[in-house]
């Protein structure tokens, strides 16, 4: 194998696979793609069947399974921080919700110096370029991109429709497309699933086009030790194959592209001598360039589950029973449809809880079964639940190396719930969810409140529940943020400040977390920056209109008023 390439990409995840595919469209460009995990085994139902999404989080084959330091505002819990490992990265193990973030997220990014071309109208063409939506393209959606997107269909679980209707009856808007003109309100939720009912990871959508190209070399089980520098120019990568301790080196003629995600990208930069000087000195790492923002500004979405018994036998509870699973698996395997072909997050919504929020600050995912996201703590009866959490918490965390060992996990602290706004939003979210669940649309299905339980009412009781039970939505981001301020790590094209030949392209470069799931936006960002790397003209800006709430009230009159108790 040659050890010199035009580009070396570190991390074959949601962003890295996009770059590998787009850069190798130019036949005279050579690319080395390094992935610490293994292949995306297509015969492994755990990563290929949408309904099996909890399984990869339970093991270590596809999951880095990071843990946080004790979180001081969460009863000092060490909290899960699962990240994808293997071709596809976190798109290989995520919940497959195709949500892009709100138009105003991007317009807000673009207010920062150097990020003027990150408005929604600049980004929308790249969302469309990446997408192939099963019901065809329009001004907001693509029809022939690498990412297969499936829309909910008639005949799916009646609880989805009842929960959306309940949200509308509670006084909130209805929308027919959470990624379309109006991203506020309740409606159906698209998913990254192929027409054959398989998970649409970036390994399937992008790498399948590119993996046979002679100018792309993919190396799996390759753990990056550090980026090599000649002075201040990134010149290559040192990496370990499998369990070996002797490093292999590869050289980059043009650029090194770091796409290892919001946890590993700052870790690799720090190990390579780019980061906070005091930390690097403490670890005896030679300083290449001081960038105090590397590993800072860490953000995530936290969420809770509100669970209810279901009085009719329409939930997915029977699908949790072992005796029913072979039939579900066979139907999925041979026909590509049935329960197995859906992630079961087919309805959701975004709302504003208070007038001071210009765009939604709370997200709902509805699930027609009562169970933890990672498959634990299933309720032993028919049930359903709402996942609810705040979108743009003011809390900020950090990632820092604990040693030079590339196989040691870093110290991670999200500092969840460290602001009063966090507590206010989560209390509001629980109380609003209860109002939604009390609406007439759910009368035929709603049993008792299982969790938190109706005895949990006061601020103090709700706060105790949040501290003990809130969990990550697995959306770490923003730890190598774009911008030009003193804490920015990269510019608006992903180029690392103060050095040459090095970019970061993944969720870590978001300056602020978006309103929703991260995968679609991470792919969009990679598509957009790929054009910059290739020195191509950006796609023409969109002029599609989009909803801005303005002076509209956050909600109308609920059909059934519910006392806050």
Swiss-Prot record:
**GO MF annotation: an example:** flavin adenine dinucleotide binding
Please list the reactions this protein catalyses.
Answer: choline + A = betaine aldehyde + AH2; betaine aldehyde + NAD(+) + H2O = glycine betaine + NADH + 2 H(+)
Q: What is its EC number?
A: 1.1.99.1, 1.2.1.8
What the entry lists under Gene3D superfamilies is as follows: FAD/NAD(P)-binding domain, Glucose Oxidase, domain 3
Q: Which residues are catalytic? A: 475
- Which keywords label this protein? FAD, Flavoprotein, NAD, Oxidoreductase
The cellular component terms of Gene Ontology attached to this UniProt record, alphabetical and capped at eight, are: membrane
Where is FAD bound in this sequence?
6-35
What general EC class does the enzyme of this chain belong to?
A: oxidoreductase
An example of a Pfam family matching this protein is GMC_oxred_C
In residue numbers, the region (Disordered) covers 541-565
Is the keyword Cytoplasm assigned to this protein?
A: no
Q: Which family does it belong to?
A: Belongs to the GMC oxidoreductase family.
Q: Report the protein's function.
A: Involved in the biosynthesis of the osmoprotectant glycine betaine. Catalyzes the oxidation of choline to betaine aldehyde and betaine aldehyde to glycine betaine at the same rate.
What HAMAP family has UniProt attached to this entry? Choline_dehydrogen
* Protein's name in the database: Oxygen-dependent choline dehydrogenase
Q: Which gene encodes it?
A: betA
